[in-house]
């Protein structure tokens, strides 16, 4: 990655002197372009998905609906409708509603262990969805059908080995998601996972987990990512339909306010600490004795939080909630994210992206 920073520094020095120089990849970059912002950023992720900015909104079950996904896509990113656990009619209605908000690319997420995964996979083809992200299983059974329909397939992975397997299956890109993220999590941090995955696969890698501002975006690009996925940052935007009480919990969270439940049962979930989470952790001390009670507690726990019961529900959130302090529109958030990222280090995200391309080209 030293090469990336070296090129970024060289170009910053040249641009501030209003000197033009051909980019090593053949891209002419002059002083005016330096200030045009993220709308000029082109990476393999933006090219693959046909989006303007390399920012994807994470699929949050019971939260990421047409209102949120449509707003993010319209703002230039990629909005994702979360289909996990949802009836097919709801999915159809949400995709159609999002299409009324935006004509830009739109995605949907499939949790492959869901009982209706096969029917959902076919429905998304019928609905002509642009992108499918996947989790909780292998997309092998649906890859051929999706690819034949022109759908871009992006699995979410928590390990390098899984990223390599997804590339072999034909995935167009992967989201490398660290344990800092909210919801279901793996073991590796984003800082450890992301460079390992970018070194191991040739397809584009999207960084996720612990990213909520320009610093996180710049860091992900420095580690080799060509885009980022964020969930927690979009929980408080105007277009997110969760209850105000949920949003206020995110806005007031401190860096030590999340907890991971479910590790003992093999289904770890990161959420904010509250009465419900503490009760779960206490019962998890003896799974053999309390397993049935835990199962009953989990039923409807996310729905309760989303609807406003923030004491007796699961408030899924990433650790990065500690840096989320304001309510804004999705467009305002995306514009702010890019401005912040490009203010760091005196270089544009385009320069970082191009430096990463050079690194791949040179085999570094």
In which residue ranges do the predicted regions lie?
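N-terminal amphipathic/basic-hydrophobic helices that include classical n-h-c signal peptides
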Residues: 1-38, 363-364
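Residue-level detector of intrinsically disordered, flexible termini
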Residues: 1-3, 7, 148, 304, ...
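Generic signature of intrinsically disordered, low-complexity, basic-rich segments
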Residues: 4, 12, 42-43, 65-67, ...
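Active-site entrance/lid segments in N-terminal catalytic domains of soluble metabolic enzymes
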Residues: 34-204
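Glycine-rich phosphate-binding active-site loops on the catalytic face of alpha/beta enzymes
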Residues: 62, 77-88, 176-187, 211-244
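Conserved active-site-proximal phosphate/metal-binding subdomains
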Residues: 192-206, 212-364
């Amino acid at each position: 990655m030293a090469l990336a920073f070296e090129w970024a520094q060289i170009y910053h020095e040249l641009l501030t002197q209003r000197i033009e120089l051909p980019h090593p990849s053949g891209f002419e970059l002059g002083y005016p372009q330096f200030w045009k912002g993220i709308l000029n950023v082109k990476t393999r992720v933006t090219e693959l998905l046909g989006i303007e900015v390399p920012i994807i909104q994470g699929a949050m079950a019971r939260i990421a609906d047409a209102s949120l996904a449509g707003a993010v896509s319209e703002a230039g990113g990629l909005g994702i409708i979360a289909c996990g656990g949802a009836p097919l009619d709801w999915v159809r209605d949400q995709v159609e509603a999002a299409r009324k908000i935006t004509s830009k690319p739109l995605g949907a997420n499939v949790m492959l262990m869901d009982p209706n995964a096969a029917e959902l996979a076919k429905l998304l083809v019928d609905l002509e969805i642009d992108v499918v992200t996947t989790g909780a299983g292998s997309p092998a059974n649906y890859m051929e059908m999706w690819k034949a329909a022109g759908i871009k397939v992006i699995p979410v992975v928590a390990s390098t080995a899984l990223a390599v397997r997804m590339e072999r299956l034909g995935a167009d890109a992967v989201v490398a998601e660290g344990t800092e993220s909210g919801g279901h999590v793996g073991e590796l941090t984003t800082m450890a996972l992301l460079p390992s995955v970018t070194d191991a696969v040739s397809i584009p890698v999207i960084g996720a987990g612990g990213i909520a501002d320009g610093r996180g975006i710049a860091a992900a690009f420095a580690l080799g990512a060509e885009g980022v996925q964020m969930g927690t940052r979009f929980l408080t935007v105007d277009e997110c339909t969760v209850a105000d009480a949920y949003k206020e919990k995110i806005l007031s969270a401190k860096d030590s306010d999340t907890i991971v439940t479910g590790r003992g049962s093999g289904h770890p979930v990161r959420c904010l600490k509250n009465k419900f989470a503490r009760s779960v952790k206490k019962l998890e001390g003896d799974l053999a004795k309390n397993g049935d009670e835990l199962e009953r507690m989990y039923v409807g726990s996310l729905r309760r939080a989303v609807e406003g019961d923030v004491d007796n529900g699961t408030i899924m959130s990433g650790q990065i909630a500690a840096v989320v302090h304001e309510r804004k529109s999705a467009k305002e958030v995306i514009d702010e994210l890019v401005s912040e990222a490009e203010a760091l280090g005196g270089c544009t995200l385009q320069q970082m992206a191009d430096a990463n391309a050079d690194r791949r080209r040179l085999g570094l």
